[in-house]
Amino acid sequence: MTDAAGRVEPSGVWATAVGVARVRAMETAREQPLFRDPLALAFATAGGRGPGTLSPPRADEAARRRWLEVALSIVIRTKFLDDLLNRAVASGVRQVVLLGAGMDSRAFRMDWPTGTRLFEVDTAEPLGFKASVLRQERAVARCERITVPVDLREDWPGALAAAGHDPAQPTVWIAEGLLIYLPADAVQSLLERVGALSAAGSRMGLTLGTRGVVERFRGDAAAGSAASMWVSEMPEDPVGWLDGLGWQAETFTLRDRAAAYGRPLLTPSQQDEGTGALVSAVRTAH
């Protein structure tokens, strides 16, 4: 289906990107936001999640608290990955690849060094929807932005190469809110492909779903909601797992990062939170 502007209406997994934009718009409207995303409101509005919906849903208290927990996790992971990207380009990396880019607007809202090339990899529908909103907003990227319309289940490395990615140069890879929707074998395959395209000095930022979080949210999730589509759980030893793939990794819990950013989680600590849901990694082998 299309909307009045002729845009394909969000559906399936990529529709969750509009929900993420809604949360980022809410954060941007705060007095002291952890980041500013001026395009988030436009994406949310175009996807039917505009100003009238920029508040927590009125549901039962348990559902409302879960929603707030997810929303805060989106804010924290966004800040975490912004910082990771800033460190990567400060170290000299000039290639950025956003896997499952969705409504990510970092090409437009962050400051990038001259020569930075940012590749947005996603299927054609969300990229087309996004392009329509960007035209409407007359948005201008702050770096060289290259869209790569391809399904991650297909030959995305080939499409990325055709778009100009140079595997001989370091790259910073971002998989934000993506891996939780993929089965374990698909996650393994994706990261093996990423490794094959990563020169020494490359960086990677991942968000992972811990077993407890997936089970706790998916159990009573509404049909079609983001949580109802979560399938992937973080390995028991993510650092060891990534070491086997050629990456030196650090993991961080959302709770620890939230406290560090001055936004402490108000929910009680869960025994099943695991070692971390946020990952920063550096390429050690190729």
From Swiss-Prot:
Query: Which residue spans adopt a coiled-coil conformation according to this UniProt entry?
Result: none
The source's superkingdom equals: Bacteria
Looking up InterPro entries in the UniProt record yields:
Ppm1/Ppm2/Tcmp (IPR007213), SAM-dependent_MTases_sf (IPR029063), SAM_mthyl_Trfase_ML2640-like (IPR011610)
Q: What class of enzyme is it?
A: transferase
| Enzyme nomenclature, EC number | 2.1.1.-
Q: Which GO terms describe its molecular function?
A: methyltransferase activity
Q: Which residues cross the membrane?
A: none
**Which terms are listed as keywords in the entry?**
Methyltransferase, S-adenosyl-L-methionine, Transferase
Q: GO annotations under biological process?
A: methylation
Cross-referenced Gene3D superfamilies: Vaccinia Virus protein VP39
Q: Which Pfam families match?
A: LCM
Q: Which residues bind S-adenosyl-L-methionine?
A: 122, 151-152
Q: Is-annotated flag, keyword rRNA-binding? A: no
Sum up the protein's function in the record's words. Answer: Exhibits S-adenosyl-L-methionine-dependent methyltransferase activity.
Return the similarity comment.
Belongs to the UPF0677 family.
Protein name per Swiss-Prot or TrEMBL: Putative S-adenosyl-L-methionine-dependent methyltransferase FRAAL3718
